Amino acid sequence: MMIVIMDNGGQYVHRIWRTLRYLGVETKIIPNTTPLEEIKAMNPKGIIFSGGPSLENTGNCEKVLEHYDEFNVPILGICLGHQLIAKFFGGKVGRGEKAEYSLVEIEIIDEDEIFKGLPKRLKVWESHMDEVKELPPKFKILARSETCPIEAMKHEELPIYGVQFHPEVAHTEKGEEILRNFAKLCGEL
C-alpha cells in the first residue's frame, strides 16, 4: 500500500518523497528502469513520474501507460513526467517561448480533484526548457499561465494527471496540498 515514484533523474525527486512521507504516505523511489512485473508486485496505489533531463531517458514510464489497465491507479506526471504523458497520448511537446527557471503564476481553470480547495491563482516553481504545446486527445486543461498554455492537465476518463511545475518544491504555493490531494485520490489519506 504505497505510492511509487519513478525516478527520471530530476533534481527534486527526494523532495516528492519527503513531502509525501511528511503527510504520512508510504512512498518509495524506484529507478525508471524497474521492470513492470516488479512494479506490479509492489501493488502501488498511485504512481508518480518525476521530472528529469530528457524524454529519451524515461525508462519504463511509457510501458506503465501502455499497460495502464493492469495497474488502474492514479498517475501524476511532474514536469518531464507531464510531457511524457502528453506525448504518449498524442499531444505535442516542444521548446517553450523561453526556458523557465523561476516562480510563475498559474491560473486554475478547472480544479478537478488535484486542485480541490485551492485558490484560483498560485505561484509555482518551474524549471524546464520544453513544455506541452498541444493537448493530447481526451485530455482537458486544468491550469495555464501567461507563458505556458498547458500548466496542468487531466485525462477525461482516467485519473491521469500532469503538471508542468514542481509541487514538491518549497517555493510552490500550496504544493503540499496538491500532493495531498493526489494521495487522497490514491486512497492513501
UniProtKB/Swiss-Prot annotation:
It catalyses: XMP + L-glutamine + ATP + H2O = GMP + L-glutamate + AMP + diphosphate + 2 H(+). Its EC number is 6.3.5.2. SUPFAM superfamilies: Class I glutamine amidotransferase-like. It is an enzyme of class 6 (ligase). Keywords: ATP-binding, Glutamine amidotransferase, GMP biosynthesis, Ligase, Nucleotide-binding, Purine biosynthesis. The keyword Hydrolase does not apply. The keyword ATP-binding applies. GO terms for molecular function: ATP binding; GMP synthase activity. Catalyzes the synthesis of GMP from XMP. This is GMP synthase [glutamine-hydrolyzing] subunit A. It comes from Pyrococcus horikoshii (strain ATCC 700860 / DSM 12428 / JCM 9974 / NBRC 100139 / OT-3).
